[in-house]
Swiss-Prot record:
Pfam families: DUF732. It is a single-pass membrane protein. InterPro entries: DUF732 (IPR007969). The lineage of its organism: Bacteria, Bacillati, Actinomycetota, Actinomycetes, Mycobacteriales. Coiled coil: none annotated. This is Uncharacterized protein Rv3067. The keyword Transmembrane helix applies. Keywords: Cell membrane, Membrane, Transmembrane, Transmembrane helix. GO terms for cellular component: plasma membrane. It is found in: Cell membrane.
Length: 181
């Protein structure tokens, strides 16, 4: 092995130094002095606003969660009047006649009119809902339209379904049926 000169290179010194630019001085911002009183006052104001917003949220939640049925807007949404409901309704609407024999008569009358259904319990429930809707102030035409929109399979037999429902479960509304229905 031979002695070789080192291969490290060093920067050559320059004769003229580059001018230094101090940009930090151009953008210096002097901090304003704030007393502790101002700092604590700002903190108290922010805390008060936060507590106020939290209280408003809790009050709104409490009001919505503890609404009574007699208050406006608290009424439960009625179940759809479709005939293809999978589960049987738990209770018949109030304002209808109650009897298993009436239910059999109702289903037989629907069958005689050519109205088929996949769930007899849902058909009975919807028949009783016709009476509930009439008792709630709906007209026969409104009940027919609501039933058509929720059970399009009934088609042109919807009026007959409503008529059979009225005659079976709430005969006190017979007078509101259109002639010949």
């Amino acid at each position: 092995m031979r002695d070789e000169p080192p291969t490290d290179t060093a920067a050559a010194p320059t004769t003229g130094a580059a001018p230094e630019i101090d940009t930090a001085r151009e953008y210096e911002v002097t901090a304003e002095y704030q007393s502790w009183r101002v700092v604590w006052g700002s903190a108290a104001a922010l805390l008060t606003v936060g507590v106020g917003i939290g209280a408003a949220i809790l009050l709104g939640w409490f009001t919505l969660a503890h609404r009574h049925p007699d208050q406006p807007g608290a009424a439960a949404t009625p179940p759809p009047a479709g005939l293809t409901t999978r589960s049987a309704p738990t209770a018949a609407p109030p304002s209808t006649l109650q009897s298993p024999d009436l239910d059999s008569v109702f289903l037989g009358n629907l069958h005689d009119r050519g109205i088929s259904f996949t769930n007899p319990d849902a058909a009975v429930y919807n028949g009783k809902m016709v009476c509930t809707n009439l008792g709630g102030g709906m007209t026969v035409q409104q009940v027919v339209e609501a039933l058509q929109s929720s059970s399009p399979a009934l088609g042109d037999r919807t009026t007959a379904y409503v008529a059979v429902s009225i005659r079976t479960y709430c005969p006190k509304y017979d007078a509101v049926l259109p002639p010949g229905s």
